[in-house]
Amino acid sequence: MRHFYKLALMLVALAFIVSACGPAATQPPAAPAATQAPAQPAATEAPAATVAPAATAAPAAGGLQIPEIEQGKFNVAAVLIGPHDDGGWSQAHYEGLTYVEKNVPNVHIAYIENVPEGADSEQVFRSLSRKGFNLILGTSFGYMDPMATVAEEFPDITYIHLTGYKSNMKNFGNLMGAMEDMKYLAGMLAGSRAKKDGNPKLGYMATFPIPEELRLGNAFMLGAKKTCPECTMDVRWINTWHDPVAEKDAAASLMDAGAQVVLTGADTPAVADVAQAKGKWGITYDYVGSCKVERCLTTIYWNWGPIYSKIAAGVIAKTYKPGFDYFDADSGSLGLFGFMEGQTMTKGVSDLPAADIQMVKDTLAQMLAGKFTRLDVFAGPIKDNKGKEIVPAGSKFEQADLDQFPPGAPGLTCKYCMYWWADGITAELPKLGN
């Protein structure tokens, strides 16, 4: 659901926040006997610590060193927006990559971290392609258009873009998961915690004003209303995915303004550290191992390994067709810390009312069984924070409604769309335009 690139965002949100072909890529080796994705590990345990594979020195692209392939192997590279050990979004992808190496035969992996969106990323994707990588993963929203451009130049290489909304249905695919499922459940916990503490005020640290951030904030508020009808939520826009200082400042601002529980949409565990210092509660994001302090209520996390392995095995076997892949909780790739198999609830959750905890467990069970999806999170009746009916009773969202701002914006066609704040959110909508 993810990182920000100004040109791409202009196409989605009315200018909101605002090549030379290389030699042909080496062909992947013959498919191994087993083409099915490897068995998924327990989605509830933090992946074991891994050591970053060494990258062989090579000509730089935009000041970044490009790793080498290993001849005779299927070569997979990931381009990361932040450090591979950031304790959040990039680390979750990095550990998913190492899972591929361990579970799909004859695979070599590499990664490049701290790659800015824009021109530098296009150089990186082109350089990796010229090196001969067979599968290239781009893990930030703002890599979308650069990847699309490079994919046209190298038709024999498979490119997968995380988040975004584009695919050429040939060798450039789109992949994302319904984290709104887990944020909805986290909202239930946050509402219950705030109500029990006698302070029904929540906070949301939003990154960039894109549809993804509005839908996640709305999902969180809709969940909170299930356990705390009187709860309200303030919002701070931080305009970054990874900046521990900015994240701490925003968390402190929300907590000082009265928020009892604060959810982050950014990459680091900073919100929990601030909560620990202020005696409030923080909800971290992206990485299973990010909920380390006592005042971390839970974390909503990704488990990319099985999904990446399935894609890699499919590309090797020539059975994978890039397109639009948007997975729900039943994929096993989304988690709510403290509630998955083998996990223990945090101290901040364990003393909540039994009925609230059971509601979370029951809804999660439905999600894991495929009986409750991201579209059910946004089932009517839903009103916005001005009292306007957004979704009538008996209706629910479609995928385009999750991904698009108001009707008429360039890009997807939507009916209800995602340019509204749910009832209980006290912030104003970000303005469209320059």
What are these regions (language model features)?
Residues 1-8:
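Bacterial N-terminal signal peptides that target proteins for export
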Residues 15-20:
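C-terminal motif of bacterial Sec signal peptides marking the signal peptidase cleavage site
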Residues 29-30, 233:
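Extracellular/mature segments of secreted proteins
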Residues 36-434:
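A residue-level marker of the well-folded mature domains of exported/periplasmic proteins
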Residues 22-25:
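Bacterial signal peptide processing site
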